[in-house]
Each structure stands twice: as C-alpha cells, then as structure tokens.
Regions:
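ABC transporter nucleotide-binding domain
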Residues: 174-269
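Helix-to-loop junction immediately C-terminal to a conserved catalytic motif
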Residues: 52
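Conserved ABC ATPase signature
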Residues: 130-134
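Catalytic Walker B motif of ABC-type/P-loop ATPase nucleotide-binding domains
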Residues: 155-158
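Conserved ABC transporter NBD signature motif
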Residues: 60-75
Length: 313
C-alpha cells in the first residue's frame, strides 16, 4: 500500500450548478514536493483548499496521514499564501515570535527555531528590521518562515516565487528542497513558473476543468507528451541530407524530419534516448556529424499539449 501523506478521494465541489472540481482522486506521498498545475479557473485552488481543510467538499473525503482531515491535530499543515500576510510594523523576529506564540510553541523551542529560520532564509541581518522596510524578496521569504514556524508536517506553497529576482528565487528553491530532503516534510507547490515546477517537483498533477488529466514525474511527462525534443544536425556531406531524412522518417516515435538551411531537424519524443540509433543511420550512409545540438522537450510544451493553453490564460 502506498505511503500517502494526503489522499483525496473522489473530491467534488459544486457551486450553484457549476462543478469546480469533478471527482478528483490524488495521493500525495510523504516527503515529496508535489507540483499542482492548471490554467486559471481549472479548479486547482479549490482542490487544494479542500485537501487542507479550508473548504468543505460537496462530496468525497480527504485523509491526512491515515486520519480524516476533520480529526488531524492543529498545526499539521502550514500555509504560505501568494498574498503577503505580514505585520508591517513588527520586526522579522517579532513577527516570528508572535506566530510561534499563536501556535503555542514553547519558548525553549521557539527561540532557536526563530534563529534557524532567520539563518536559513538569509534574514538574520534583518532580524530587528521593521517589515515595512524590507525588500519584496525578503518579505516573501519571511512569509514562508511564518508558515513553517510551528514545524508542520505538510507545507502548502502558493506561487512562492511570485515577483522574486533570480537570486532570491534560488534561496527559496534551496529552502524548499531542504524541507523535503533534510526535514522530511511534504510540500504542495502551485506555480506558474514552469522551470520552478520542473526543478522542484518529484511529481506533478495537471488539472483542467476540475479533472485530473495527468499525474507523473516531470521527466516522464516530458518524455511521453508534447511536441518532442529537437535534434539539430549538420552532416559532413549535405548531399546526403535527403538520404538520412528517408532513413529516419519511418522510425518509431519520430514526429518529423526536415531540412532547414542545409541542416537536419529531427523532432521526436525522448530524442536523447534515440540518438544512438540516429547515429547508426548516419554511419550507414558513410558520413559524419560535424555539428549537433539538442533542445529538450519542456514542461511548457507538455502543459500546452494537455490543456491547449498557456498557464495564465
């Protein structure tokens, strides 16, 4: 039996005849970063709210660590919303202490935990700085620290990198990885940044029109779905280009082979895995490859293939 931290079983949510979420069943494993993607209006926010107990489903149920969600202990889940939920007139340290007190964290545990969060999220030098004077990146990192001050087993991150510069984004990404790899937390991540979902997620669920349409690892999604990788190849003898095109076109999972400005463009699912066979066909023609490059299929390609739209449409 799979060791799930959260199980959504046949979740459905209806609003006056509109079905926002339609019979959704998902299992989120303990200690994984679980990406949750979908176009605007797809039902992902409604789904997550039901899965963490903020919204009652019309039907279906949610099991958290073997218990009905209605019976889990306070503080099991930490929420980091996209909107900054900060006290502008408090310092970073005062904010963390206040949130810890709300969760009744004992002082002997609270103090070292506050300091560790300030260190891990590069806020130590701003510990006594009033929140209103922090940069946008610092505020977003503090927003995350407030969500995890009570050491929740499950952390929900809603667009955590929104508006961040690349340096701040890397700090945040490293901390998210550490929550999984060092602390063993289960992280649910929603994001419109495809590279973020790809880099951080162990598995990704893509939903549209309230239904789950695909659930797999980023690597498997890119291998199996989308327009395919592109191999751009230049032969030592361009006169052999058409011969190679005829050799490769009938091959299984080759989507297209065309000549562009004296080079050959080969589009195929999991093209990297097919490179050895491509090279065998080149050798058969008695030519060599002078130049080659590969552009891998992206998660953006996969998303558009499955939903027919961009992430923010």
């Amino acid at each position: 039996m799979m060791d799930y931290m959260i199980e959504a079983q046949d979740l459905t949510k209806k609003y006056e005849g509109l079905t926002a979420v339609d019979n959704l069943s998902i299992g989120i494993k303990k200690g994984e970063v679980f990406g949750f993607l979908g176009p605007n209006g797809a039902g992902k926010t409604t789904s997550i709210k039901m899965m963490v107990g903020l919204l009652r489903p019309t039907s279906g149920k949610v099991i958290v660590n073997g218990k009905d969600i209605k019976n889990i202990e306070k503080g099991t889940i930490g929420m980091c919303p996209q909107e900054l939920m900060l006290w502008e007139n408090l310092t970073c340290k005062e904010s963390l202490n206040l949130m810890a007190d709300m969760y009744e964290v004992p002082k002997n545990i609270r103090d070292p935990r506050v300091q560790k969060l300030l260190d891990d999220l590069f806020l130590s030098e701003k510990a006594d700085t009033v929140v209103s004077k922090l940069s946008g990146g610092m505020k977003r990192r503090l927003n995350l620290a407030l969500a995890v001050i009570h050491e929740p087993e499950i952390v929900v991150l809603d667009e955590p990198s929104e508006g961040l510069d690349p340096q701040s984004r890397r700090v945040l990404w490293n901390y998210i990885r550490a929550m999984r790899d060092v602390e063993g937390k289960t992280v649910i991540l929603t994001t419109h940044i495809m590279d973020e979902a790809d880099q951080l997620s162990d598995r990704i669920a893509i939903i549209d029109h309230g239904k789950l349409i695909r659930l797999d690892t980023p690597a498997n999604l890119k291998k199996e779905i989308g327009e395919g990788d592109v191999v751009d190849m230049k032969l030592s003898d361009p006169l052999k280009n058409q011969d190679l095109i005829q050799e490769l076109t009938p091959q299984e999972d080759i989507i297209s082979v065309v000549e562009v400005k004296g080079r050959i463009n080969i589009r195929a699912l999991n093209a990297i895995g097919k490179l050895p066979k491509m090279m065998q066909r080149v050798e058969k023609l008695g030519v060599v490859v002078e130049d080659i490059s590969v552009r891998q299929n992206t998660l953006e390609d996969v998303f558009i293939e499955l939903t027919g739209t961009g992430l923010r449409e």
